[in-house]
Amino acid sequence: MAANFWESTQRRNWLFTKEELAARRQQLENEDPSLVTMYPLPEWRHLYNYFNYQMLRLAKNLSIRQQAIATAQVYMKRFYTRVEIRSTNPTLVLVTAVYLACKMEEMPLHIRNVSLEAKKVWPMETPSLEIAKIGECEFWLISEMSAQLIVHQPYRTLTALQQDFQLANDDHVLAVSFLNDHFMTDLPLLYAPHTIALAAIMLALVLRLSKASSSNNAAAGQQGGAQAGPLGITLASGLSMFQQAVAAKAMTPGGSGSPAMSSPIQQNPPNQAYQLTPQQQEMFRQQQMQQQNRQPETQAKDSPQKEKSKLQRFAAWLSESGVDIEAMIDCTQELIAFYECQESYNEQITRDQINRFVKARGL
């Protein structure tokens, strides 16, 4: 087992550029173009979203931790860089990926229990979820991944940096939600775990600052002022402020320059708000209710100035580190694009398109 990410097979063999990843997928589709034409599928973000939801259904029945689910999601991504999805039964693959991930994350489940619970979740798929089928698919997964099963996750980096950046519990919880969501994108195949963790921290701090500023403005304009809600959060202005903070620190006598910041951040229109996941919406709603019930002196702890100082401290640290800030920014843009993509996601359509080729091909 690799002691760290830098010596791991994940870094050597399972990180690609966007162009390399697109080329791999195109190569798989080119092996049988008629199959691709006959059974069109949604974009990968929609497929990942669907697979994530299905895994969570199984995880709930088997009390599986998020760490194992995250590893299973990475297994599926790796597998489908080498195998065309239309030649598989994705439900069987995801069940097997969960079973294998639980072994690797030291919470093994008996294959009989996995098969039994999977049949309860997907009764129409019962013939494909027999023990023998899962066992056979497990060997297929291991073979296609060249037995390289160690997955380094960004959660450890987030936990290690929580105290360094003085992240409040709410900051940490929000950053974790972004990490959970990034598994529904291509990011685990594109960037190192620490880069993704730092991007999640940045998004959490930006959103928390936006929330604190909105609450402060609403309190100052209670008479006739519009009430600020936590769901219509615009990230463009926050990311712009973050870039300016890093650039300003780099120009100070004690700061070190950061060439990665010389390229401008691609921003969306400043009046465009991004839709958060239902879990994040519920979390923000609960946080807002808690804030309304606090005493005035407690509310002051979440002042915009305090949240801004966190972001500035984080930006200062980045400007003096060797972190690839451009890669971080790209991670945040991928997540933003994912949230935008969710607005057009339709679970029923995605399920029907998958079931269509599975049934037609007898998978």
UniProtKB/Swiss-Prot annotation:
GO terms for molecular function: cyclin-dependent protein serine/threonine kinase regulator activity. GO terms for biological process: regulation of transcription by RNA polymerase II. Its main location: nucleus. Residues 252-312 are annotated as: Disordered. It comes from the Eukaryota. It is found in: Nucleus. Belongs to the cyclin family. Cyclin C subfamily. This is RNA polymerase II holoenzyme cyclin-like subunit.
